[in-house]
Amino acid sequence: TPNEQGVFTEDNTARFSSAVWYENIRSKTIILAGVGGIGSWTALLLGKLQPLSMFIYDNDAVEQVNMAGQLNSTNNIGKSKVDALSNTIKKYAAYNSVFAVNGRYDMSCEASDIMICGFDNMRARAMFFDKWKHHVALKPDDERSHCLFIDGRLAAEELQVFCITGDNEFAIRNYESNYL
């Protein structure tokens, strides 16, 4: 539909279609591993941005205990988290380029420029970060700034979010040394 200026926009992304970063995100593949308390909500919001594609990884099934902080409904209990979340994203974000991988993300999995970590254990975080770091190392120097690693950590009363670009060697070393 045309907006006030007569420019056609997609209704479901019109709110942020004029943002300077918007066209960039639409050309990106995003990998999000761990779709619990942080990952499930993040995936929904990313779906609303309509990236080129989004791969979500998790090997857990939805349980009653997940109702407290995760994006789930009681209708999803017993289903795989990624299948339930994928269906939710398709329904509430009108986004169909989300790919559910019902399994653990491991070193044999593909990496992408944008990787978001929603794991709840340090070993998985370290492996996921190593995979991203290796991917970035293969990029030409001028493309590394377009690579992004995000690690969200959630405790009962504390939230930490680490955002690292591929060209920030200090942040990469600091994260490895002090936060993994």
Briefly describe each language-model feature range.
Residues 53, 97-99, 148:
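Conserved beta-strand segments of alpha/beta enzyme cores
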Residues 53-94:
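Glycine-rich phosphate-binding loop and adjoining beta1-alpha1-beta2 segment
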Residues 111-180:
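E1/E1-like adenylate-forming module used to activate ubiquitin-like modifiers
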